[in-house]
Amino acid sequence: MKQLESFQIPRIVIFGPGAILKTPLVVSELKAGRILVISGKSATTAYANQVAQLLSNYSVDVVRYNEVDLSKSSYDLVIGVGGGRPIDMAKVYSCVHKKPLVVIPTAASHDGIASPYVSYTLSQKLQTYGKIVASPVAIIADTSVILSAPSRLLKAGIGDLLGKIIAVRDWQLAHRLKGEEYSEYAAHLAVTSYKIAATNARRIRNFTREEDVRVLVKALIGCGVAMGIAGSSRPCSGSEHLFAHAIELRLQEESSEAVHGELVALGTIIMAYLHGINWRRIKKIAEIVGLPTTLKQAGIDADMAVEALTTAHALRPDRYTILGNGLSREAARRALEDTELI
């Protein structure tokens, strides 16, 4: 008999043009007094200030993500407004102080807008706080705001979605070979998000219409729900993400402009090759969208990619994937050559 299961998923989701104006309605349901709004450092700060103005009946502090004082626990609610970093820091604050979390994304470049988990690199920096898990109680996705984000970030969102087919294949492999717990429902949600990206790629690739963003946001929110049901990021993060994380760790010391979803798309092509999936189709979808499909286009050195492929498995030794105990340098280079990434 299976043990008792529990999971947390967002209970309020509002998306569409002008959705940000519904923020006071959402907050009123959460009965908050003091509110911390965490913003980015760029143009997205304007949206955080707009949220603060909409909540003028409350006591609101707007703080940039890199200036948040995690020792301060006097807020009743935390709202993350912006891209990955402010939303991740809002999750950290929510988790550390057990406060409800509202997410208001200004871009849709990855599934972090709806997931309970923070980026790998941030989780490594904050290990003293333990495992960071904070599911948003509400997501307010204003598609008119997200539509104004750089198209590169929106295309990266498709890249992140393409990776779900690999994450689920890795999960199934771990279930068969290692006896890992597997949720068919969570896996189905993740694969559905992949299919939405794959089948709509040509239609939405330019992101010139609100409905293009709506398709992307729905799929990314579906991924967040899948992770909430699974109780881990397993259905949405496999070997393709390990490769991306390995590259990101190596680029930390450089002034790289690499975008997470772009790296995931490259990792997806490589891991599809290793899994025996039709990697050419995935690469074609990436080309249609306008994602990098070679290491050169992504600004990544071939030796760095080889090194990432041989060490990525060690980033999460508890997560079995197609990488197994690691690729040899010869196998890694062959995979890059056969998929024409180099």
From Swiss-Prot:
Belongs to the glycerol-1-phosphate dehydrogenase family. Its cofactor is Zn(2+). Its main location: cytoplasm. This is Glycerol-1-phosphate dehydrogenase [NAD(P)+]. GO terms for cellular component: cytoplasm. Homodimer. The lineage of its organism: Archaea, Thermoproteota, Thermoprotei, Thermoproteales, Thermoproteaceae. Binds 1 zinc ion per subunit. It is an enzyme of class 1 (oxidoreductase). Zn(2+) binds at residues 160, 241, 260. Its EC number is 1.1.1.261. HAMAP family: G1P_dehydrogenase_A. Catalyzes the NAD(P)H-dependent reduction of dihydroxyacetonephosphate (DHAP or glycerone phosphate) to glycerol 1-phosphate (G1P). The G1P thus generated is used as the glycerophosphate backbone of phospholipids in the cellular membranes of Archaea. It comes from Pyrobaculum aerophilum (strain ATCC 51768 / DSM 7523 / JCM 9630 / CIP 104966 / NBRC 100827 / IM2). It catalyses: sn-glycerol 1-phosphate + NAD(+) = dihydroxyacetone phosphate + NADH + H(+); sn-glycerol 1-phosphate + NADP(+) = dihydroxyacetone phosphate + NADPH + H(+). InterPro entries: G1P_dehydrogenase_arc, G1PDH, Glycerol_DH.
